[in-house]
């Protein structure tokens, strides 16, 4: 879209060149991937647009093929938490309604970065789409399989890495220890990385790791011992553990590329 076309749209929607905006993308993810861009999905998305208008300003809601966009003006919400609360309420109620009607869709919401003026909206829209594209990976990394609202502004370093599409460049950020464990897993199907990740995500608790992975505590201890033997990892070294955690995330990003 050219600058003049953006100006026309901005005049139509009464958008400012100085206000702070975010693009919020609402997407109905079909249980069956073949249903993406289907007529059924498009019809459900049109219904979604109507539902959203009960919660958010109708004049800033746009239907876009198989998505609904909302242009969020930060000055219209004096407390950002109020907007987040509305999004959570909206998502839950609409999802509950879909479930009751046996509609095989999941309502996902991606929140783009804050931009100044309407000319930056395309960048915010791009960010909101990225949040949705990587929703499964984000859920896994954050340990929350039910997470349905993703804010790009809160992804931190994760967003930096998902913007790198060169696999070899990404590999440079993976510590040797993680690479060794990945190679071992591929050879022996040993589940060392998944065990290590679960262990680190649960305050290095063997018991909790055992419960979540549904394996015996002795199995967890054995795998951790194997991890130390292979990598000489120091679980008390905070910078090293941070690098390992980041490396595991990057490994998952690589699997998505």
Task: Give the role of each language-model region.
Residues 1-257:
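Cytosolic nucleotide-utilizing catalytic cores of signal-transduction proteins
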């Amino acid at each position: 879209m050219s600058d003049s076309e953006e100006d026309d749209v901005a005049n139509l929607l009464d958008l400012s060149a100085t206000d702070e905006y975010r693009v919020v993308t609402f997407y109905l993810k079909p249980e069956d991937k073949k249903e993406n861009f289907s007529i059924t999905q498009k019809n459900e998305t049109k219904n979604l647009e109507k539902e959203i208008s009960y919660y958010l300003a109708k004049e800033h809601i746009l239907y876009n093929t198989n998505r609904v966009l909302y242009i969020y003006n930060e000055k219209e919400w004096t407390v950002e938490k109020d907007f987040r609360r509305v999004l959570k309420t909206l998502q839950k109620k609409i999802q509950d309604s879909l479930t009751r009607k046996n509609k095989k869709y999941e309502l996902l919401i991606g929140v783009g970065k804050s931009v100044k003026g309407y000319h930056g909206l395309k960048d915010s829209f791009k960010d909101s789409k990225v949040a949705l594209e990587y929703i499964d990976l984000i859920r896994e990394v954050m340990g929350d399989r039910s997470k349905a609202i993703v804010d790009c502004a809160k992804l931190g370093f994760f967003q930096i890495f998902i913007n790198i599409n060169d696999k070899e460049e990404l590999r440079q950020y993976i510590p040797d220890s993680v690479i060794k464990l990945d190679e071992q897993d591929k050879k022996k199907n040993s589940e060392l990385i998944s065990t290590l990740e679960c262990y680190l995500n649960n305050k290095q608790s063997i018991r909790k790791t055992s419960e979540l992975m549904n394996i015996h505590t002795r199995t967890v201890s054995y795998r951790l011992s194997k991890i130390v033997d292979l990598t000489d990892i120091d679980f008390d070294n905070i910078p090293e553990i941070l690098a390992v955690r980041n490396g595991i995330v990057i490994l998952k990003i690589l699997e998505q590329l």
